[in-house]
């Protein structure tokens, strides 16, 4: 059943909102405009072609990869674009608070590097091939801050391969991350087109009408696409489901972060940090899964975010 929503516009941080605005053919001008605020001038986009976002491994045992958005420019560059949420960064925080060795943010960075290998492999040609590649960009809009960036005010990070002299070794593989929580400008403080996009990522759902600083043509299209009243009944239902998952996951994550930090401090004082490693991690996942079930999330969603199997989740 679809219930009326108080918001006029969708939340771009939901899975439905992000893919509707940036991942559909009629709205690709919005994706192009946003990406061009991040890309170097020589790779600015005029057009993109959306590609299948699902990649299967080369063998039955290989993991598959499913991107939020995968597209290719008219000159061959490939772009993975993802909305990356804090909930998917949760386990590295829990492990550290219990004293287990882990590199800050390594889980998320490892995943980005792993994903980038698929567009590279896709370019291989049968028969004779000179190994010439077109550029691959992985763009992550982050709803969290990397742990090793918490004391850094810079919110835009462009990463590429460099040698020991900080000289670019290879310029066809780039990772671009935008840490949204660090963006705190008000409407009156917006200076650049990039600022305007970040403001909309964070505040679109709170607006009742397009404000004066956001009257550009591209944003007029965005406000039209994002207006919930323009959705079909099915689209409204899909958005409400997506919004519920986003809000439930956010609440569960915040609760678990608070509990994990409190437990870590208490355990560190009373016992030292000597917890069982594999067993402790499994118990963490099960506890998270239980809270997700209590919040009404589907087993498939819980499996995606915890790594537990459907059978394990059903047995909790």
Residue ranges and their predicted role:
Residues 2-7, 79-84, 195-316:
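Short, charged alpha-helical interaction segments and adjacent helix-coil junctions
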Residues 1-98, 103-236:
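Conserved single-residue anchors adjacent to enzymatic active/cofactor-binding motifs
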